[in-house]
Amino acid sequence: MTPLDAKRPLQLNHQGQLRHFLSLDGLPRELLTEILDTADSFLEVGARAVKKVPLLRGKTVCNVFFENSTRTRTTFELAAQRLSADVITLNVSTSSTSKGETLFDTLRNLEAMAADMFVVRHADSGAAHFIAEHVCPDVAIINGGDGRHAHPTQGMLDMLTIRRHKGGFENLSVAIVGDILHSRVARSNMLALQALGCPDIRVIGPKTLLPVGVEQYGVKVYTDLNEGLKDVDVVIMLRLQRERMTGGLLPSEGEFYRLFGLTTARLAAAKPDAIVMHPGPINRGVEIESAVADGAHSVILNQVTYGIAIRMAVLSMAMSGQNAQRQFEQENAQ
């Protein structure tokens, strides 16, 4: 457990309900299952003629993205809109932060505008924790990705994808392949799989892209792709995060693809009904072959659909938990 994750109780209210969603570390299996079950119930909303439910009517959700994102930002916007919330998306590149305003001041000003929830994506690990503890403790904070640390909603949408396509976790072998070192998605997935009872979690990559001590997540480590993929049920590919790399961690992208790129031939080592996942954006010909990304084993587009439902679940649960905590504190202050 990292110092950041030692603050896990910050995420829960006095009844153990979600009030912030910052990391998956330490969250009980029952709560993760509740998120998955709630998301399952929201999937049918997307199939309606009117894709809305009134759970967050009258509430304001602010998406504050200090890092670029298309998929995550758009699905959070859709999730909030389908819950009937008012949605504000802050373009940080054109905001006051580019004029020297601090993260603290930006969020406090938004809070003064009566925002009820912030979805925050930031390049610094721990940014969402800092905001939840020191800046806006009375506003529900959702971590949309912070540095290398965590991407909890991506982790949960991946778990929903696995559960819907494989039925559960108890008998599965799951391989996470690629740039594990720089991936907040990998960390969130390892934590979620462990909490949900997956017995065989594998990480596969070159030694230079594997974190020191990764075994603490209860995983088996492989540096040979063919060996690591043998008889797995699920393959989660990760992109090379060149923007976070320093030094000569890789000879070239071509060399990485030769050794660790997922091709049709390499996928044959997995089980015949294995599914292939990717959090996006995909680098075709770097970590995955187009024939695999677009093939029968791929559930990559399903992940996007499930992402909306997971984010609806998290937004609605965190808002409910924060409201309950606020009421509890008001009653006990009297």
From Swiss-Prot:
Alphabetically ordered keywords of this record: Pyrimidine biosynthesis, Transferase
Recorded superkingdom: Bacteria
Coiled-coil segments on the chain, per record: none
Reactions performed catalytically: carbamoyl phosphate + L-aspartate = N-carbamoyl-L-aspartate + phosphate + H(+)
Biological process annotations from GO: 'de novo' pyrimidine nucleobase biosynthetic process; 'de novo' UMP biosynthetic process; amino acid metabolic process
Residues in the signal sequence: none
Alphabetized PROSITE patterns for the sequence: CARBAMOYLTRANSFERASE
GO MF annotations, alphabetized: amino acid binding; aspartate carbamoyltransferase activity
Sites where the protein binds L-aspartate: 99, 184, 239
EC number(s) stated in the UniProt entry for this protein: 2.1.3.2
Pathway(s) it belongs to: Pyrimidine metabolism; UMP biosynthesis via de novo pathway; (S)-dihydroorotate from bicarbonate: step 2/3
InterPro entries: Asp/Orn_carbamoyltranf_P-bd, Asp/Orn_carbamoylTrfase, Asp/Orn_carbamoylTrfase_sf, Asp_carbamoyltransf, Asp_carbamoyltransf_Asp/Orn-bd
Residues that hold carbamoyl phosphate according to the record: 71-72, 121, 151, 154, 280-281
UniProt similarity note: Belongs to the aspartate/ornithine carbamoyltransferase superfamily. ATCase family.
Quaternary context: Heterododecamer (2C3:3R2) of six catalytic PyrB chains organized as two trimers (C3), and six regulatory PyrI chains organized as three dimers (R2).
Functional note: Catalyzes the condensation of carbamoyl phosphate and aspartate to form carbamoyl aspartate and inorganic phosphate, the committed step in the de novo pyrimidine nucleotide biosynthesis pathway.
Protein name: Aspartate carbamoyltransferase catalytic subunit
Biological source species: Pseudomonas savastanoi pv. phaseolicola (strain 1448A / Race 6) (Pseudomonas syringae pv. phaseolicola (strain 1448A / Race 6))
